[in-house]
Amino acid sequence: MAVQVVQAVQAVHLESDAFLVCLNHALSTEKEEVMGLCIGELNDDIRSDSKFTYTGTEMRTVQEKMDTIRIVHIHSVIILRRSDKRKDRVEISPEQLSAASTEAERLAELTGRPMRVVGWYHSHPHITVWPSHVDVRTQAMYQMMDQGFVGLIFSCFIEDKNTKTGRVLYTCFQSIQAQKSSEYERIEIPIHIVPHITIGKVCLESAVELPKILCQEEQDAYRRIHSLTHLDSVTKIHNGSVFTKNLCSQMSAVSGPLLQWLEDRLEQNQQHLQELQQEKEELMEELSSLE
């Protein structure tokens, strides 16, 4: 007899501007995994499925089932600063979770909505989109604190063998206890991208913050190496050159395209503003002619 698994969350709705920030963050480096936290709200929706039978002049319910659908709405993300760069794993410190909770409270006051930390995301450069055993165990740990907590993975720098073009895959998951085992296994959660015409202020601030965070990570790594006393002068010069090279690469791959995108967006907004002003003038002329 098959055992039906009860999911804590039935679906995830990810705002397109938050999706854009996640994607830019995942594509910022192909050597190590990156990560961040998702800010949003968890809504409960009631779904009623009823079956009726008709006997003579009365209609009565044979079976009525009330299901509570839990949907996670992700409105923005917080890009986390990595204290330890690893190729195959990422970790969230308690200090980062606390700072994210404080930011969620600030957003809740601004929007008047019950914002909180509802999940986390990280990248899988050059590897499959499916979570590893470490990812599943980490997700299970977060769910012990919050059953509605979800995990997102962005697999990037993957090349299609047939078309020879790059592609990005993403998935959302939670962890469940495996049958007759102490281990955990993943369960996939349907994820839907909610389209937006404009990018929100909070997501725009996160996108602008990305180059700063990447620069801070490089500075921290360089300072740790530079503080070692046993290094000779040639090694220190080499480390300085590597540091400069990494910063230039970030400017070329992240800061430059981001600046160009912001300038293009500004030009589009100015053009749209001119069109609206022209439309306003035409409407005012029509209104004055009617008077």
Curated annotation (Swiss-Prot):
Q: Could you say which EC number(s) this protein's record lists?
A: 3.4.19.-
MPN domain: residues covered: 12-179
**What remark does the entry make about the cofactor?**
Binds 1 zinc ion per subunit.
Q: Where in the cell is it found?
A: Nucleus; Cytoplasm; Cytoplasm, Cytoskeleton, Spindle pole
Function in brief: Metalloprotease that specifically cleaves 'Lys-63'-linked polyubiquitin chains. Does not have activity toward 'Lys-48'-linked polyubiquitin chains. Component of the BRCA1-A complex, a complex that specifically recognizes 'Lys-63'-linked ubiquitinated histones H2A and H2AX at DNA lesions sites, leading to target the BRCA1-BARD1 heterodimer to sites of DNA damage at double-strand breaks (DSBs). In the BRCA1-A complex, it specifically removes 'Lys-63'-linked ubiquitin on histones H2A and H2AX, antagonizing the RNF8-dependent ubiquitination at double-strand breaks (DSBs).
Q: Name one GO biological process term.
A: DNA repair-dependent chromatin remodeling
Give the residue interval(s) assigned to the motif JAMM motif.
122-135
Please state which protein family the record places this protein in: Belongs to the peptidase M67A family. BRCC36 subfamily.
Keyword annotations: Acetylation, Cell cycle, Cell division, Chromatin regulator, Cytoplasm, Cytoskeleton, DNA damage, DNA repair, Hydrolase, Metal-binding, Metalloprotease, Mitosis, Nucleus, Phosphoprotein, Protease, Ubl conjugation pathway, Zinc
Name the InterPro entries on file: BRCC36_C, JAMM/MPN+_dom, JAMM_MPN+_peptidase_M67A, MPN, MPN_BRCC36
Oligomer status and interactors: Component of the ARISC complex, at least composed of UIMC1/RAP80, ABRAXAS1, BRCC3/BRCC36, BABAM2 and BABAM1/NBA1. Component of the BRCA1-A complex, at least composed of BRCA1, BARD1, UIMC1/RAP80, ABRAXAS1, BRCC3/BRCC36, BABAM2 and BABAM1/NBA1. In the BRCA1-A complex, interacts directly with ABRAXAS1 and BABAM2. Component of the BRISC complex, at least composed of ABRAXAS2, BRCC3/BRCC36, BABAM2 and BABAM1/NBA1. Identified in a complex with SHMT2 and the other subunits of the BRISC complex. In the BRISC complex, interacts directly with ABRAXAS2. Identified in a complex with ABRAXAS2 and NUMA1.
Q: Which GO terms of the cellular component aspect does the record hold?
A: BRCA1-A complex; BRISC complex; cytoplasm; nuclear ubiquitin ligase complex; nucleus; spindle pole; ubiquitin ligase complex
Q: Which GO terms describe its molecular function?
A: cysteine-type deubiquitinase activity; enzyme regulator activity; metal ion binding; metal-dependent deubiquitinase activity; metallopeptidase activity; polyubiquitin modification-dependent protein binding
Major location category of this protein: nucleus
- Which named protein is this? Lys-63-specific deubiquitinase BRCC36
Extract the coiled-coil ranges from the record. Answer: none
**Is rRNA-binding included in the keywords of this UniProt record?**
no
Q: CDD domains given for it? A: MPN_BRCC36
- The residues listed in the UniProt record as binding Zn(2+), with positions renumbered to this chain, are H122, H124, D135
Q: Which SMART domains match?
A: JAB_MPN
User: Which Gene3D superfamilies does the record match to this protein?
Assistant: Cytidine Deaminase, domain 2
Q: What is its cofactor?
A: Zn(2+)
Q: What class of enzyme is it?
A: hydrolase
